[in-house]
A protein has these predicted regions:
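Hydrophobic alpha-helical transmembrane segments of multi-pass integral membrane proteins
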Residues: 1-444
Length: 444
């Protein structure tokens, strides 16, 4: 009898037939799939409503007044928080709750903990957005939102750390797991800093806006300290299979994480130019370690998704390089707000969003009950629009904000609408996938 069957029988307290074991396992799988769909649907809601739509509204105001100061900093910070924590953060928690029991071959987590985590995380991110936009009772709700997010992550961490993998014959954890752990530490640091900043702002009582200098450093921690290592870790796990790459250079990936961590710490200390150089070295080493610029070992696995999937994955890492190069340029000149904004957008949309669009539409249908992606053509359409919109946004932000070309102000709302269409298509494609019947049910 298998180890899984033994655990199921131990929990039942009696000997079970093969059919009973299969039925128990099937019910657990369905419960985890429904939980994942809940997290992903919540992330899509944050992506579309407080994230993208508020961002479009901000750009329309900026374009019409031809100045970035026409929109309050709190609105911009609320938009960014909804995108980073409400969208991608919720995705990461959902995938973590679903996949970690699978990867470690153990019993699923107690679902009550996952539900409480979802409630706290969703409430925290929603309250953060509401206080940034409406400022109602912000001295109470701002630190409360940060406390909710921190508590949700601590519950998630407790669930993860409470389980141990079976002996697989390997010495120590796999390298991609170490990278994900580094990212989790970065997320914890981000949430702690966010909670401390919220308390400070609430006690001071002057404004709910983060000071510009601190906000710039905090964004480095959020993106490079938390999101980028997560992408690298999951890239190391999935890309060799999906793209047909040669085995990754594991030590090289750890070196990339080390260089990236030095860059983040240097940025938090205020040495921005040196920090961006370290970040550039990290992203370049990660491309080498993942072998993204090398010939593939075998054909890419594109069944169920568009065949252009590998192209967009590689283009995402190119956007990461562009983001750091723009950061070096911005740190070398004065009044470089437009260049900094373009650098952040190249990272958050060009790199991070493109990876979410690519990998998400590849794995989430299978995780949600072995479904098939609703439309590979919609996948291509969303990725093309996202790339075009990002290219327009990055170029127009530099040209307009830096005073190189006045006509570039009119490109900003165009880029925003294109990107809004892209995320809408992405969201619709996933939602239609979730409401469709899995192939097994169709056959029955």
């Amino acid at each position: 009898m298998s180890a899984l069957a033994t655990r199921v029988e131990n929990q039942a307290g009696r000997s079970l037939s093969a059919q009973e074991i299969f039925e128990i396992t099937r019910v657990r799988e369905q419960s985890l799939s429904r939980l994942l769909i809940l997290y992903i649907s919540t992330g899509l809601a944050f992506m579309l409503l407080p994230g993208t739509f508020l961002g479009v509204w901000n750009l329309l105001a900026i374009s019409s007044h031809r100045t970035a100061s026409s929109v309050s900093a709190s609105w911009i910070q609320a938009h960014g928080h909804a995108q980073i924590f409400g969208w991608i953060g919720t995705f990461i928690l959902g995938i973590g709750f679903y996949s970690i029991p699978k990867l470690r071959r153990m019993n699923p987590f107690a679902l009550w903990a996952a539900w409480i985590c979802w409630g706290l995380w969703t409430s925290g991110t929603a309250l953060r957005w509401l206080t940034g936009v409406y400022h109602w009772q912000w001295q109470v709700l701002l630190p409360l939102s940060a406390a909710f997010e921190l508590a949700a992550f601590l519950i998630f961490s407790k669930c993860v750390s409470g389980h141990r993998p079976q002996d697989s014959g390997k010495r120590g954890l796999e390298k991609w797991v170490l990278v994900v752990i580094t990212a989790a530490v970065g997320l914890l640091a981000t949430l702690l800093v966010n909670f401390g900043a919220a308390l400070f702002l609430a006690i001071r009582g002057a404004s709910s806006d983060l000071p510009p200098g601190f906000d710039q450093r905090f964004l480095v921690l959020e993106t490079w300290g938390f999101l980028v290592p997560f992408v690298w870790g999951f890239s190391a796990k999935w890309l060799p299979i999906f793209l047909g790459l040669r085995p990754i250079r594991e030590r090289g990936l750890l070196v990339a994480v080390g260089a990236n961590s030095i860059g983040v710490l240097t940025a938090m200390a205020g040495w921005i130019t040196l920090a961006v150089i370290w970040l550039l070295s990290g992203i370049c080493i990660s491309i080498w370690a993942l072998r993204l610029a090398e010939a593939r070992q075998q054909p890419a696995k594109t069944k169920g998704v568009h065949t252009s999937f590998p192209i967009f994955v590689r283009s995402a890492y190119l956007w990461g390089i562009i983001a750091t190069i723009l950061g070096i340029w911005a740190s070398a000149v004065r009044n470089s707000h437009g260049i900094w904004g373009a650098s952040r957008h190249a990272l958050t949309v060009g790199f991070l969003a493109t990876m979410v669009f690519s990998i998400g539409q590849r794995i989430l249908p299978a995780f949600s009950g072995m479904r098939l992606l609703f439309s590979s053509k919609l996948m291509l359409f969303s990725l093309l629009l996202l790339t075009i919109g990002c290219l327009l946004r990055v170029s127009s932000e530099i040209l307009a904000y830096q005073g190189f070309a006045g006509w570039a102000w009119s490109w900003l709302p165009v880029s925003a609408v294109i990107e809004m269409t892209a995320v809408t298509v992405f969201g619709v494609n996933l939602l239609l996938t979730f409401v469709s019947n899995p192939p097994s049910q169709v056959v029955q």
